């Protein structure tokens, strides 16, 4: 599946609604699981986006790393819903996909799947379209490896992909794929779904081999 097709599917999905701004969807086709996370959808989501002091992300009482507090709160409500499908032994491949607010949740989900399914690490994939920065502070090489299959897709000046500011200690994880041209859109317009999809289609026309599993890194 091309990146533009994957993005369109993420944007146009019917999502399972939750009471914590953690809307998600999933496909289980044979033994392949794909989990989708919806973009910002209302005032509550935006309040979560702006709640960006760093907080400790813990598992079994141990601090793993530090993350955007608002996104971490949302992700914590999703774990009980997603854990059974991620750990299901019938699943032999996992892909996580998100846009905007949902891309931040995809960052968490990718790391969770990495730790929960070490047998699937070599094929685990994640895609964060218009992804904000989620992780705060320095990571060890071992920590960074959790996102070796994750790609942040940035439409150049997309304002969301530049927030929270790196000057505050926030950083992207995985690899960064930049699409589009500088100065073509305003920072806000560069984040709009219609413009991200347009630039993905143009990118794929220039790079015919580009799919959701194979694309040039920048």
State each model region's role.
Residues 1-97, 101-218:
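Non-catalytic, mobile gating and regulatory segments of ester bond hydrolases
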């Amino acid at each position: 599946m091309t990146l533009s097709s994957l993005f369109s599917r993420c944007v146009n999905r019917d999502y399972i609604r939750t009471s914590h701004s953690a809307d998600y969807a999933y496909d289980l086709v044979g033994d392949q699981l794909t989990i989708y996370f919806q973009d910002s959808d209302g005032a509550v989501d935006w309040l979560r986006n702006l709640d960006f002091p760093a907080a400790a992300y813990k598992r079994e009482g141990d601090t793993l790393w530090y993350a955007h507090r608002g996104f971490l709160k949302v992700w914590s409500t999703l774990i009980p819903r997603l854990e059974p499908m991620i750990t299901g032994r019938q699943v032999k491949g996992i892909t996580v996909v998100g846009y905007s607010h949902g891309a931040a949740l995809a960052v968490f989900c990718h790391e969770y799947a990495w730790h929960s399914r070490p047998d699937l690490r070599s094929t685990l994939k994640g895609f964060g379209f218009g992804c904000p920065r989620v992780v705060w502070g320095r990571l060890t090489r071992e920590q960074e490896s959790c996102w070796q299959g994750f790609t942040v897709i940035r439409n150049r000046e997309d304002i969301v992909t530049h927030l929270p500011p790196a000057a505050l200690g926030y950083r992207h994880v995985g690899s960064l794929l930049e699409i589009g041209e500088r100065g073509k859109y305003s920072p806000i317009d560069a984040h709009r779904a219609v413009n991200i999809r347009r630039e993905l289609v143009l990118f794929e026309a220039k790079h015919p081999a580009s799919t959701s599993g194979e694309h040039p890194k920048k």
